[in-house]
């Protein structure tokens, strides 16, 4: 049975609108991941947005519960039901039908469509919900209905807001397999399994805890697809169902182990985590050091550790992830489209961790021998595993689980705090919270007038030294912080540097403004004092002319993000930025280097919007209204209820508090000067506009003129080609480079990197020297990695070998069975490419 389709069709026939699964990354700053079916309807339930015209909905929602409040990660593999990623089937009523219909629909679907026997079904209700008891008694005898308290049968969205009792349908799996003391209805055993939760949202809880009836009660239900699939197949464990069979087969083949072996928990961990990795990567989450990216990294590393237990010492998870992409390609087409990218990024992350996994495991095993009698694992060692070897804390605890031990959290946290102190970013002098507390008590937030003007009269409220201790006056040649009653200087934020400028007194320059920062809601400017100033002085604050150039680069950054999303896809999201007067730097999520065609398209799109002379528009509106308009926002930012929205007509709309040009025409022009990788899944573009754009054009024109003179040819390309030919002819002998040769099963294996020389000639020399050969030589040149490979009387084709390795470098290979070449721009992946080249060759030789 196709349970998903059966469920959606059933409720569609009952007048429900069918909604697609929303992304795993919700447009909700309070959630790390989408963790329930009701998330996409949250604003409807809370009344933020009006009810839809069809007040009934149904969906099959992909959910993630790993990290944050809802975190099942540590239980996966050890229980029958826990998953990081699962599908939640649900039906919803927005003030339309209520308990009677919800119970009727649920009973009909469970007994008729799913075919569960009514004698095996049990019901739980809230202890005060007599109405639900009476409704259930139409289908179930009273002795199979159990009243429970708030802990089990009362649901609420938060400390205040919509809430209500809930009712759950349980199924008796039979006493044949469950004979524990807790295996009774209402006990802690697994015999009676919850399959469907019906939430009756009928109250509003006020801030002081008082419950008031809602004028239009609603329904929210949830049922796990994986759980139902296992029940229909009479399996006692979700992982034993046909949903996971293709994954178990792949893992079994890779590890040469049987699923029913002692490694069964590890099979289940790898299968579950492969699903999570595939969907998260395909939906634009990338491996990172924080936030969702770090949760993804933790999931992958936990899977690798369980693979290690099964003897898998090389990258393997990417192959299981590939099976996930194929398995779900019919219901989630984007998995098929992004399969290559997903597998590549997974492989690269595996390679990075495998470099330290072996050493980390050695340290872990050695430390196990010194466990104290309380089985407390040294917190300092746990921190070293985390900090040096990349072992997330929950991974270390997971490894300790089988030894009945746990980490000394106090020791771990102590090491973490020490590291935070060492690495904490600081400006000249360090923040002193006690001093800031005194400042905040003494001064109200100063008024920022920089949106309206670049100059204003202002009163000096106070001066502060580098430790933010208040001083009464400022003397020439001192560097001090100043707090003005009102200020036109924009504080560093949103990637833009702080304003610079000057303070005038009596028509003379009294201080140079070096920088502006916001600390705890107060805008401070850093001054270099030229003329003595004191508290209470009236000054004229002037913003430097470079403000306009910063604004040009800031507006260009907005246009750049929109262009990237149009060219590369909606998975692109900001990962960091820097906006200065002479350049911009924009970091964004994308799995591979941009090729020349993509870069040209992005640059052309930005310039097209500049040449349209689009006016900027600044609006203030509620956060949800801004999101509904499609405004881009940073998940890491905490936004107020009302936000500032900057748009350039249809070209760009973002939440932003920064300074922008009034018209895109003022940007002048836009040029990308560099594209590079920052980390796995994060790319960086550096660009210029405005005066810097003009200056770059001047410099390039000058270089072009000098090149013509040097080449003695007005046609530079022709001159360069002539010079290259001359150099080639002048080379009397090839560069001799000796690379290490390994002999394996009679075949000479060469994999290495050279700094100079013709790598194709090197391959030819190696082929003439050896009767049996597998050789791949890499060379770094012009921000690219090129490779050449040769095969002679060996069990692999050169073109297949080269193409597989080239994908790691963000490129493709081509050639014949005996010789091939390739290249790519992901130079940061050179080591991973070397590892893959050698491992592929070794497998071919071993096979």
Swiss-Prot record:
**How does the cofactor bind to this protein, according to its record?**
Binds 1 zinc ion per subunit.
Q: Which reaction does it catalyse?
A: tRNA(Ala) + L-alanine + ATP = L-alanyl-tRNA(Ala) + AMP + diphosphate
Its domain of life reads Bacteria
Binding of Zn(2+), residues? 554, 558, 656, 660
Q: Which GO terms describe its cellular component?
A: cytosol
Choose any GO biological process term that the UniProt entry carries and state it: negative regulation of DNA-templated transcription
Residue span of the signal peptide, if any? none
Enzyme Commission (EC) number = 6.1.1.7
A Pfam family this chain is assigned to: tRNA_SAD
Main location per the UniProt record: cytoplasm
Q: Show the domain comment.
A: Consists of three domains; the N-terminal catalytic domain, the editing domain and the C-terminal C-Ala domain. The editing domain removes incorrectly charged amino acids, while the C-Ala domain, along with tRNA(Ala), serves as a bridge to cooperatively bring together the editing and aminoacylation centers thus stimulating deacylation of misacylated tRNAs.
* Main function: Catalyzes the attachment of alanine to tRNA(Ala) in a two-step reaction: alanine is first activated by ATP to form Ala-AMP and then transferred to the acceptor end of tRNA(Ala). Also edits incorrectly charged Ser-tRNA(Ala) and Gly-tRNA(Ala) via its editing domain.
| Protein name as catalogued | Alanine--tRNA ligase
Q: Which organism is it from?
A: Helicobacter pylori (strain Shi470)
Q: What is the lineage of its organism?
A: Bacteria, Pseudomonadati, Campylobacterota, Epsilonproteobacteria, Campylobacterales
């Amino acid at each position: 049975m196709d349970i998903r389709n059966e469920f959606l069709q059933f409720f569609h026939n009952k007048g429900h609108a069918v909604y697609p699964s929303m992304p795993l990354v919700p447009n909700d700053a309070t959630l790390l991941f989408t963790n329930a079916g009701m998330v996409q309807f949250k604003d409807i339930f809370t009344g933020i947005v009006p009810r839809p015209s069809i007040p009934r909905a149904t969906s099959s929602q992909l959910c993630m519960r790993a990290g944050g409040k809802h975190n099942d990660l540590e239980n996966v593999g050890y229980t029958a039901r826990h998953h990081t990623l699962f599908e939640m089937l649900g039906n919803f009523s927005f003030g339309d039908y209520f308990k009677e219909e919800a119970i009727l629909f649920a009973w009909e679907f469970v007994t008729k469509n799913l075919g569960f026997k009514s004698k095996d079904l049990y019901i739980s209700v809230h202890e005060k919900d007599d109405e639900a008891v009476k409704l259930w008694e139409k289908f179930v005898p009273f002795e199979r209905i159990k009243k429970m308290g708030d802990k089990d049968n009362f649901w609420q969205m938060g400390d205040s807001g919509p809430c209500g009792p809930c009712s759950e349908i349980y199924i008796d799996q039979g006493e044949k397999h469950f004979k524990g003391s807790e295996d009774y209805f209402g006990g802690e055993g697994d015999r009676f399994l919850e399959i469907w939760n019906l939430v009756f949202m009928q109250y509003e809880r006020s801030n002081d805890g008082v419950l008031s009836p809602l004028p239009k009660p609603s329904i929210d239900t949830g049922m796990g697809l994986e759980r139902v699939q296992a029940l229909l197949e009479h399996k006692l464990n979700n992982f034993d169902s046909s949903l996971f069979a293709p994954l178990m087969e792949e893992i079994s083949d890779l590890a040469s182990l049987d699923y029913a072996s002692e490694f069964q928990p590890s099979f289940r961990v790898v299968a579950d985590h492969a699903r999570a990795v595939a969907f998260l990567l395909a939906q634009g989450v990338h491996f990172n050091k924080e936030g969702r990216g770090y949760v993804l990294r933790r999931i992958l590393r936990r899977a690798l550790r369980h693979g290690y237990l099964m003897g898998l010492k090389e990258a393997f998870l990417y192959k299981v992830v590939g099976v996930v992409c194929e398995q779900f390609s019919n219901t989630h087409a984007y998995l098929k489209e992004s399969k290559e990218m997903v597998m590549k990024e997974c492989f690269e992350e595996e390679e990075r961790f495998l470099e330290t996994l072996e050493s980390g495991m050695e340290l872990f095993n050695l430390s196990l021998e010194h466990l104290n009698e309380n089985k407390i694992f040294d917190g300092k060692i746990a921190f070293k595993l985390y900090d040096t070897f990349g072992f997330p804390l929950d991974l270390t605890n997971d490894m300790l689980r089988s030894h009945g031990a746990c980490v000394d959290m106090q020791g771990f946290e102590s090491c973490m705090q020490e590291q935070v102190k060492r690495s904490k970013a600081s400006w000249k002098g360090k923040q002193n919270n006690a001093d800031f507390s005194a400042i905040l008590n003494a001064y109200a937030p100063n008024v920022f007038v920089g949106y309206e003007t670049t100059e204003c009269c202002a009163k000096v409220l106070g001066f502060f030294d580098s430790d933010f201790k208040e001083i009464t006056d400022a003397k020439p040649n001192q560097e001090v912080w100043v707090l003005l009653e009102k200020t036109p200087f924009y504080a560093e934020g949103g990637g833009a540097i702080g304003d610079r400028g000057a303070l005038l007194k009596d028509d003379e320059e009294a201080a140079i403004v070096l920088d502006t920062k916001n600390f705890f809601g107060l805008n401070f400017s850093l001054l270099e004092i030229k003329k003595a100033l004191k508290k209470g002085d009236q000054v004229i604050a002037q913003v430097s002319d470079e403000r306009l150039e910063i604004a040009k680069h800031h507006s260009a950054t907005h246009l750049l993000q929109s262009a990237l999303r149009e060219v590369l896809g909606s998975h692109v999201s900001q990962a960091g930025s820097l906006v200065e007067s002479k350049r911009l730097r924009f970091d964004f999520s994308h799995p591979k280097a941009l090729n020349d065609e993509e870069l040209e398209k992005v640059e052309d799109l930005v310039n097209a919007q500049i040449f349209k002379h689009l006016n900027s528009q600044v609006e203030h509106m509620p956060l949800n209204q801004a999101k509904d308009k499609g405004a881009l926002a940073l998940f890491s930012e905490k936004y107020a209820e009302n936000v500032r929205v900057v748009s350039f007509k249809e070209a760009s709309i973002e939440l932003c508090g920064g300074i922008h040009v009034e018209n895109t025409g003022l940007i002048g022009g836009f040029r990308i000067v560099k594209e590079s990788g920052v980390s796995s899944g994060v790319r960086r573009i550096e660009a210029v506009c405005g005066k810097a754009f003009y200056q770059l054009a001047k410099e390039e024109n000058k270089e072009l003129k000098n090149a013509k003179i040097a080449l003695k040819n007005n046609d530079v390309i022709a001159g360069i080609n002539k010079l290259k030919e001359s150099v080639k002819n002048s080379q009397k002998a090839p560069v001799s480079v000796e690379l290490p040769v390994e002999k394996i099963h009679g075949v000479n294996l060469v994999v290495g990197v050279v700094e100079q020389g013709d790598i194709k000639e090197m391959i030819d020399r190696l082929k003439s020297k050896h009767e049996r050969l597998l050789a791949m030589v890499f060379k770094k040149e012009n921000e690219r990695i090129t490779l050449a490979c040769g095969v002679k009387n060996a069990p692999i084709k050169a073109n297949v070998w080269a193409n597989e390795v080239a994908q790691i470098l963000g490129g493709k290979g081509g050639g014949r069975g005996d010789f091939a070449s390739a290249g790519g721009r992901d130079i940061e992946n050179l080591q991973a490419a070397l590892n893959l080249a050698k491992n592929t060759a070794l497998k071919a030789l071993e096979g």
